[in-house]
Amino acid sequence: MSKSWNHDRAAKHIDQKIADVEEITIKDYVRDMSLESIPTSTAYRVDGVHMYADIMNLEDMLNITAVEGTECHKRTLRFLDQHYRAVKRILNKVDARRVDFHSQRLHSLFTKPYNTESGAETKRVQRAVATAQLIIDVLAETGDDDEQIPAAKVRIGIDTGLALAVNNGRSGYREPLFLGDPANHAAKLASNNKARGIYLTNNARKAIGLAESDEPEKSALTAIEIKACQDAAKLDVTSDEIVEEWREDLKKNPIGGYQFSRQTPPLRDMDIYSLTPANSKRQEMVSLYADIDGFTAYVADHINEKTDDVVRTLHVIRSELERVVTSDFEGRRVRFIGDCVQALSCDGTAHTTDEEKSVSEATRLAGALRSSFNLAIERLNAEGIETGDLGLAIGFDLGPIAVTRLGAKGNRVRCAIGRSVIESEKRQCACSGVETAIGQVAYDAASKAVQNLFGKSRKTSHLDYNEATEALADDGDASAKQARSEAYAGSAAIIRADERQVQPHSRQKVDGSR
């Protein structure tokens, strides 16, 4: 049987998820509340400072050799592992929370001092700035010349304000996920430019008495401004102490050699939580990012009213997108990053990847994700749930990808790295909420039908499941022809894409305007 999306199957799952979040509780986060294992039906308004640290030379590590081979990936994973361990040690010392470590980006949160203390926001921002400089100083010392691991080049973004905390996992792996302006703006500041340094939004600048900037992304804090924050924060740790403890920890808990094996498709059977450096996966596969476009503004608009609808919308859409990836197309979700899903897919055998088929199926997967997204919006609105003006931006690419977990035993984080991972995210970021984009490597490996669908721009609009399957099948794509043949054999009521009106649930134009 080929992989397929089915309207009735999707509708049934969406309706069940809507029923699961009928009752929602919104709480204000206060002293001593736990953010661990937040129930699906609960969300917290959290007033805090969000910091994103972007390791800017990850891409250089992945391109250190002409061919993206195993040694390139081993060296890159060791690079990330060493720096992750150092940053985690810093956050523990300064009483900040690690939210996520996604490839080159580390997201952390400062909630202390609480708002019951005078000048709490100012003190939180000062503490975040002092910590940011500590991270920069430590990561300048945590390379390894013997292993050809360079020091990390870091750019840091900081914002302050209210965010919405919900759960970010399944089963026993629930961690808080933070939605809204502060996390989003901090992330954009960290990744918005090639210049290193510490960058604050105007909200964060005002909190510590600095003048607003017309271009915050180009206004790095000066040494004097950083020193003022360090003096005010009075962190009880120095970079020399962190580096010394980090080196001792590496001796006691060495990273070990990375060993790769292939994951026999389907990738949904990959147990990421069992992976270690000695048991890592690596093969040619498709990396895909699907981002709910407009969600940050939607959260900001509803942070104080109809917040329960935000929680319902997120959980329903996110759950359905994951179902499409894992159940309909037998792929593997790596993680949720805010309102974005990161996934992997692969077709082939235990020994080889069928690259052309993998790209064809990824194209139809992208279409299925949009069909489920549109259907979820439709069903949510039918229940009177306010969903704002949301879209879905999708990007994917093909290439060698290594999947493992970083960190010491008992404190590991998932990681999927490869040039295609970076490129697929770039392609997604270049899309509006109605667009799907394909990377150059995937395009080159694709069938002629897929290339015709995306065109020279390698981007297309309003691509849903029916359109993707019909267009590819009509143009001779073998995977799509098989899927259509099986669908027609199972039902005489299949609606051809050219016979139905596409009604996207985003008012965005292709160029991103409204």
From Swiss-Prot:
Residues 496-514 have a biased composition (Basic and acidic residues). Its EC number is 4.6.1.26. Its cofactor is a divalent metal cation. It comes from the Bacteria. The keyword Metal-binding applies. GO terms for molecular function: adenylate cyclase activity; metal ion binding; nucleotide binding. GO terms for biological process: cyclic nucleotide biosynthetic process; defense response to virus; intracellular signal transduction. Mn(2+) binds at residue 291. It is found in: Cytoplasm. Ca(2+) binds at residues 291-292, 339. Residues 495-514 are annotated as: Disordered. When crystallized with (non-physiological) ATP it binds both Ca(2+) and Mn(2+). The enzyme assay showing cUMP synthase activity has Mn(2+) and Mg(2+). It catalyses: UTP = 3',5'-cyclic UMP + diphosphate. Its main location: cytoplasm. Keywords: Antiviral defense, Calcium, Cytoplasm, Lyase, Manganese, Metal-binding, Nucleotide-binding, Repeat. InterPro entries: A/G_cyclase, Nucleotide_cyclase. Residues 49-190, 286-428 form the Guanylate cyclase domain. A ribonucleoside 5'-triphosphate binds at residues 52, 105, 178, 184-188, 291-296. Monomer. Pycsar (pyrimidine cyclase system for antiphage resistance) provides immunity against bacteriophage. The pyrimidine cyclase (PycC) synthesizes cyclic nucleotides in response to infection; these serve as specific second messenger signals. The signals activate the adjacent effector, leading to bacterial cell death and abortive phage infection. A clade A Pycsar system. The 2 guanylate cyclase domains fold into a pseudo-dimeric structure; the second domain binds metal while the first provides most of the nucleotide-binding residues. This is Uridylate cyclase. It comes from Pseudomonas aeruginosa.
